[in-house]
Amino acid sequence: MNCDRICELPDSLLTQVLSYLPTIDSVKTSVLSKRWEFLWLRVPVLDLKVSDFPDENYASFIDNFLEFNRKSRMRKFKLKYDEYTYDDDRLAGWVVTTVDRGIQHLDAKGFETNMCVREFMPQNIYKCNTLVSLMLVTVGIENPEFVVSLPSLKIMHLEDVWYYDDPLIMEKIISGCPVLEDFVLIRPIDFCNLDVLQFLRVRSLSLRSFRLTFEYSVSCTYFSVEIDAPRLEYLNFNDDQSDTIVVKNMTSLSMIDIDSEFNVKFGGSRLEPGDLRKRDIIRDFLTAISCVRHMIISRRTLEVLDRYSKLVPIPKFDNLYRLQAAVSRSMLQLLLVFLESCPNLENLILRVHLQDFTVSTEPEQDGLTYVPQCLLSSLECVEIRELIMGEETGEKLVRYFLKNSVVLKKLILRLEDSSIANQDSDIFKELSTFTKRSRSCEVIIIH
Amino acid sequence: MSSKMIVLMSSDGQSFEVEEAVAIQSQTIAHMVEDDCVADGIPLANVESKILVKVIEYCKKYHVDEANPISEEDLNKWDEKFMDLEQSTIFELILAANYLNIKSLFDLTCQTVADMIKGKTPEEIRSTFNIENDFTPEEEEAVRKENQWAFE
């Protein structure tokens, strides 16, 4: 036997290795040699897509596998209905079985056969000592009939998941997860149940990362969200639908990624000076997150903040050292106003959008004359992405940063069009004519 | 501030001094420290020096604190470089990570081998790992038929 070291591993370790594979790859090893024929059967993992099975007999395969391993524990069950099949309500049954066998990772992606029909998960997903990660996509979850108990659950990902009518369902689930660290909630657009979960409260002492997506689809003001998580380090806030937004106890917040208009379209109708309620909501939100160190902010969020900043000044983000922002042509002045709130900014990454659908009500400023504090004292690195040289906005920005940044060490330009490969020398020549306030500043061009 | 050091002894008699905080990423070593039997050093009968060096390298990198602040992204890149090894070394690492009970190293090494299997045909897998096919053609055909779907 000339076999390389892999054959010296004992069966138990070989099955461990196979458990890191999708089941289809694990099954293929059955023909490698006699030793491998039945190893795959002992892997405590099912990781399948419906599309793996050309004749759709995935159900009998799963049944047989679970029957064969009746006495052993299951570590992971992952099933994706990535193709249309005759929906036969088998998923819930398999979830019941695997949860009963001490499952640690449950990942189910359902298929929406038609509007208003979903497969609902069984109650036993709410009571499991071993579950560490739960990922559910395009399925439904019922109102918990008992106290939720998921003492090991660290990761929860609920995407396009339907609920029944219990307004406290999310709170009940979260309070049953004392070690939950990572939560992703992508709320569905459920036209059949528009008034479900109007008030979302996420309150957790253990949560470290939370991503919320709630895309605007209904013109109304009755949705609201509250986030209370003192250990939260990362927040991704992409909720455009909630009208009332409360964020509190963000004492550990280090990074925020925000893309929201705060439902200003309908809840605040253009943020008239008279709309005190919305002004207060935005002010409290910004104050709550003002300790962040790293921020990613979208164009529409900046626009809302710009309108808002005319009523009340934006709070200072004293700890913000790194900012990524998307801006468009008409927003350059707005950007500078925002930068004034970041007195210790070291690192700035800008993405320039040329498409500009907003009509600027202010006269186009020809020169950017205002210089925020951070350019004078802390800003060391500026990166401009999707830049088109020769285009006015990009050039304006490059000139501006070179002329006004006192301590700038690096200016990185990521060019949009790769066709300019041989024009590098021309660009460099032109750039070298721009006034540079920071002598040691290095300009780097990347295609 | 001096940190507590312990001595690890490989199967081929070499000694390695390591910070206790770094070494107890191994649950096996952590238990020994708790049971207080480390005074004369910890003999690791199943791990030879060549492998122990790699294990210590891994544990040092993964001991993240103020002195070694490293992002997850950077760790992932480092993992890739770290695992650029000969097959035999990778299998020895699996055995060592299993024996020393270092979960993250065990996951990494197993995943690396799994990635060498994933997406390949049985012939390619046999070739990668030098596995001899001891099925007769009829036997192999019968096994394939059992799970036809996987081979299509």
Swiss-Prot record, chain B:
Major location category of this protein: nucleus
Function: Involved in ubiquitination and subsequent proteasomal degradation of target proteins. Together with CUL1, RBX1 and a F-box protein, it forms a SCF E3 ubiquitin ligase complex. The functional specificity of this complex depends on the type of F-box protein. In the SCF complex, it serves as an adapter that links the F-box protein to CUL1. Plays a role during early flowers reproductive development.
Organism: Arabidopsis thaliana
Quaternary structure and partners: Part of a SCF (SKP1-cullin-F-box) protein ligase complex. Interacts with ADO3/FKF1, COI1/FBL2, EBF1/FBL6, PP2B10, At3g61590 and At5g49610.
UniProt KW Hydrolase keyword: no
Classification lineage: Eukaryota, Viridiplantae, Streptophyta, Embryophyta, Tracheophyta
Protein name, entry field: SKP1-like protein 12
SUPFAM superfamilies: POZ domain, Skp1 dimerisation domain-like
Pathway noted in the entry: Protein modification; protein ubiquitination
Protein family: Belongs to the SKP1 family.
Keyword Nucleus: yes
Signal sequence bounds: none
Domain of life: Eukaryota
Location(s), subcellular: Nucleus
GO cellular component term, pick one: nucleus
Tissue expression summary: Expressed in young seedlings, roots, leaves, floral stems, inflorescences, and siliques, with a slightly higher level in inflorescence than in other tissues.
Keywords annotated in UniProt: Nucleus, Ubl conjugation pathway
